[in-house]
Amino acid sequence: MLLVMVRSSTISPKSLRLYCSGHIIDSLRHSISRWNSPSGYCSNYYFSKRKHKRHFTSSVLSPVTPIVHNLFDELPERENRTMESSFMFLRDVLRSFMMRTETETPRSVHCFALKCGLLQDLATSSKLLTFYGRTGELVSSSCLFDELKEKDVIVWNSMITALNQNGRYIAAVGLFIEMIHKGNEFDSTTLLLAASALSSLHLSRKCSMLHCLAIETGLVGDSSLCNALMNLYAKGENLSSAECVFTHMEHRDIVSWNTIMTKCLANGHPRKSLQYFKSMTGSGQEADTVTFSCVISACSSIEELTLGESLHGLVIKSGYSPEAHVSVGNSIISMYSKCGDTEAAETVFEELVCRDVISSNAILNGFAANGMFEEAFGILNQMQSVDKIQPDIATVVSITSICGDLSFSREGRAVHGYTVRMEMQSRALEVINSVIDMYGKCGLTTQAELLFKTTTHRDLVSWNSMISAFSQNGFTHKAKNLFKEVVSEYSCSKFSLSTVLAILTSCDSSDSLIFGKSVHCWLQKLGFGDNMLSANSVINMYIGCRDLTSAFLRLETMSETRDLTSWNSVISGCASSGHHLESLRAFQAMSREGKIRHDLITLLGTISASGNLGLVLQGRCFHGLAIKSLRELDTQLQNTLITMYGRCKDIESAVKVFGLISDPNLCSWNCVISALSQNKAGREVFQLFRNLKLEPNEITFVGLLSASTQLGSTSYGMQAHCHLIRRGFQANPFVSAALVDMYSSCGMLETGMKVFRNSGVNSISAWNSVISAHGFHGMGEKAMELFKELSSNSEMEPNKSSFISLLSACSHSGFIDEGLSYYKQMEEKFGVKPVTEHRVWIVDMLGRAGKLREAYEFITGIGEPQKAGVWGALLSACNYHGDTKLGKEVAEVLFEMEPDNASYYISLANTYVGLGGWEEAVRLRKMVEDNALKKLPGYSVIDVRCLDTVS
């Protein structure tokens, strides 16, 4: 039997020979040598003993307080006590006071035993050693241990136990090595204690050595020892060896079954855990609360609701009803929550007789995971007000995470204040990490950075949270600098995948491509290259850096392993970064491959791409595909459809989709309001707003202000302004930008400037709006002053839209030289690459000044074909200045690019009319009529009288 066990386990015969030759002791010594000085493997233990030996004699044998002397007042006939009566009394005292923690109590007993000469009784000495260990008096216990001339296995075990109980695991292993080295006998308890110490030191890889000792000495039949070996093997992720120990156990108790099941679950094998449970029930072993908690947790991991319901029934049938057994009830709550049945989870929670903080945390996390955030906050309130349960660290971490996901900065700050009052931050670093993460998700990077810098003891999670906070809020430079600090702070081997993934999100522009590639190399170096999560994140990084070639190349190299997430990374990534056509092409490639079926995320990306490209027919196809392939249309998908139809100028379909939503959320209302305002349906926006029963947010008011701008209605706009002030939204940078745009478009530029200056926090959008407003009103010099003020702001930099507003202002005010100078500085000084809109305003600027030939040379000198908007600006200038020759040449280009655009024909016809060329004008007009082309008429809007109010 012994030979079979050696061969079938992971313990090689060579390992067994190592034991026989005594080298196993040296191997154990080598394992813990990095914690000890060269002088000895228990140097800390022996050093304390030498240092305090004299102190031991004086302190233990010194007179004790009268209160402690009263321990011996009950001894009958103290004057005439015999050795036997003293011995019996001492044994009784040791039994009675074994749970005492007062330091003087064991010293008094020690003093009495010393006077009576009872210390050489090994049973008494071992109990006294245990007594010292429980009171934390290791110095005294070590001196007593050394004074014993003879030591049996119980004495050695008592001393090792004392060291383990007081966290001196290195000394415990050292004493175990000394015990074997001196040839002392040991038993299964000794090996169990050594296994416990190795487990605490994370030396699970040395479990095979203890296993060898157990096999050689025939102690492997002890169930408790086998359970400890299984635990130690599994802790080192060596589950196969743990299973081997379990397989060869002759006598398995419930602890053995629970150990193997819990370790399978902990090592990511929930199905194995369930298989062992099936074997256990077949063997006739009855389950206990630990068993049921484990197998129900395994059901949670694989999200098997049907199996979970069956286990729930078995729990009740076995007499472990969740109402009476809280641990089982907590597991059932978590199982139902993870399987999406929050109603059943809530029912079990309400039926619990004695709820604890774990019960509340389980249902709270369940609500949060299923998007029921209001119910989650309700549980938090119930914990404190009804159940009188104080939230613990796990509760705080969960609530902080919810606040971060919902961007509830006010509630998040309140939770932070609670952690400070309860002194949780000083007790648990995970609380600080969760608060840093919450502040990052709420956009409060200043608060996150302050908390990070004031934290003295940071771990890798702290760094990851701060890097993510910087990356999520656009502070890419700070994120990269912090990553460099992490590299210098930690060695490569200690890096986690989360660290590299956190910095990858900061690589979102072409300027970050080189840095992103270096991070990609780090992933490969750390061995995370084949990890699906890292591979998909690398794809997103390359898409964000505009390197589509590398992104698609990475996808191609994953031909055998890529999953739906990989395709969604490309489809959604391209759609969100502006590569809409590539997003649709990726979907076509996935469909042609035929291995993977699309899901909700896929359709969200393709519908968004169709909307941005204005492909209404393609969008309708995806709408039909969603109806056909999904059980029901998710509200998020319907909101995306509304946005898509709005961008494709199909208002009727957008409103129809909105009407089909059974329970529209605020996002649904905002989407339809934005769709209407984008398509000049301002009055419909306000009519729809009157039916809104939900509390509007900042995005709602941005849509209302946009509609007011289109209507030229200051009365509507001012009412909306009053409403958002009452709700405290005036400081929002996007609201500020919309207010500036509304007031300036309605002729109230001074009011717009007051809003801009008083808002406190201005986004780049607000700056762009105020620059554009001054340019629109012919105040080009003021617009340039504002641009200089923006460019000198260290917290933000001018972007593409900033230069569009600036060049527009220069064009309207006739500042040609300044405009050309700013155009030149765009890429050289600010790193902004010119696009079509910038070139349109340069052509318009030159055209207004009559420099038509220079405008033509500007277009042709760019070196790449220009879009119709650029040529259209030159055609308008030719019309204004009556240059029919150049106008005809430009018009021919436009007729080829957009043959169905009536405005080009009419613009050229008007040029001929101005110079008396009626025949050409008539011919062009006839072409418009024959082709059934229509030009949208221009119009102006004024606010004559507005009797309606915004409610």
Curated annotation (Swiss-Prot):
Region (Type E motif): 870-945
InterPro entries from the UniProt entry: E_motif, Pentatricopeptide_rpt, PPR_At4g14850-like_plant, TPR-like_helical_dom_sf
Chief location category: mitochondrion
Subcellular location, record wording: Mitochondrion
GO function term, MF aspect, one: RNA binding
Protein keywords: Mitochondrion, Repeat, Transit peptide
PPR repeat extents: 121-151, 152-186, 187-221, 222-252, 253-287, 288-322, 325-355, 356-386, 392-426, 428-458, 459-489, 496-530, 531-561, 563-597, 599-629, 634-668, 669-695, 697-731, 732-762, 763-793, 799-829, 835-865
Transit peptide start and end: 1-63
Gene3D superfamilies documented for this protein: Tetratricopeptide repeat domain
Keyword Nuclease among record annotations: no
GO cellular component terms, semicolon-separated: mitochondrion
GO BP field: RNA modification
Disulfide bond sites: none
NCBIfam families given in the database record: PPR
Family per record: Belongs to the PPR family. PCMP-E subfamily.
Protein name stated in the entry: Pentatricopeptide repeat-containing protein At4g19220, mitochondrial
Gene coding for it: PCMP-E2
